[in-house]
């Protein structure tokens, strides 16, 4: 592209040397990734501090055996007690599983969130998980990264869809740094946070942020994978592939059970008529009592996952732990503990795979791999079935193993597990509450825009009414004088609408002069009128237009009060939608310019 002398004038030099929009997005994405990587280090440092300050010395006492074992419940209870001051200082921001609320803020409210929740989330999750309660840190670190991305968006004064993308970029960076898996971080943000609705330009932001966060994490921790998975191979593909497919079905079934128990237990705790500060303590006590017999359920369970992957799991113990970990996670988060479900899902998947693999290997030792291989595939498959995010699970496992041979089994089990779980329950573990609230965050951007526009802002308030007692000839005169409207509300003596009349209604009597003179508008009008209120949205209006094949709809004060306040025209709805799309496009474009 040639630049003229005019372009080189002082007034144009500033803009000439400014980076393009895509370059600015990459710069901001890099910044988000670096900060997300640092946040991951801070998060893990605080978690390790709590763990070594409370859990390690406490468990050392309990490990002496005898009556000391009965003191184990005090360890997880101590963490919940320490949450109380935080909950009092910051009501509504400490207790419970918060990822569903996070998804609502990202996909419905544009990703705007409070910065202080970063610190609160780090502390509350560290106290919950670091003292042995059953939860994971991956969901919270995604929220922390997302909140940081949102904060950076505010600093650069971006708005609209850009804030949402930067929030997702922070999530990608947080997860990538946690697992040392940049590709999985990208798809976590794309599949789980953005629910699969993103543009190509947004995808590049996720990639850059995830990569930079991984660089920071590897610089600090090294290139050590989250789980050192042994060398994997298919002993006999023809025999093992069907076995993995069966395991995929099993993963889907258990995932549905997991989701059901998770929300059932939470609902039971919410129904308890006691102080919210007491509920997490009760939950922690239950965890501690269970851990006396099965300590593997405590915390994120990563140590036991490593044992299972190494093939050291005992069949009956792993089988019991499937249900105990499901219950323990539901109790911890359902009672008000702070944390995520990512790590528990990995734990449950590993013990399902480990126990299943032990059984099939004992039955067919010459054609199957060891139980550790099935546990490794189970890690990702159960995560996929629980979150309905198979691509994230596939890449996560691939990056953790670095073995391309694992791709085929993990693809099959993840897709089958997700398909089974989705068939039995349309919601993932993160979207159940949204469905209960009748919020559909899977809908596209177009529908979201239409639902944001109220009918009251689009209606034509100047309406020509016609009395139900008027004769048809008078109506025809009105039609002849009409310029752009051929739908007229029919009103009674009180002024309330009793029907609507259109050209379609009078076509049948146009050539019957006698009937035209004797019939009234009330005789031929449509009585069963489809109406809207000013508070309805234009998405509902367009649905009505399409179903009935009409061009105008009367707008009344309320369904009970048929007092017409205006008419809504299909073309006005389309114009309003186009204006809003243009407005959002200009807003996002302007926001990107402000980065300079």
Tell me what each language-model feature is.
Residues 440, 451-464, 470-473, 505, ...:
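Bateman (tandem CBS) regulatory domains
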Residues 496, 561-563:
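Residue-level signal for well-ordered, solvent-exposed loop/turn and beta-edge residues enriched
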Residues 449-452, 500, 531, 567:
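Short aromatic/basic micro-patch
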Residues 586:
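Conserved structured catalytic cores and adjacent interaction surfaces
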Residues 466-484, 491, 510-517, 531-558, ...:
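The conserved cystathionine-beta-synthase
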Residues 187, 499-506, 565-573:
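Short hydrophobic beta-strand motif reused across regulatory alpha/beta modules
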Residues 1-452, 456-457, 461-462, 467-478, ...:
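Alpha-helical transmembrane segments and immediately membrane-proximal extracytoplasmic
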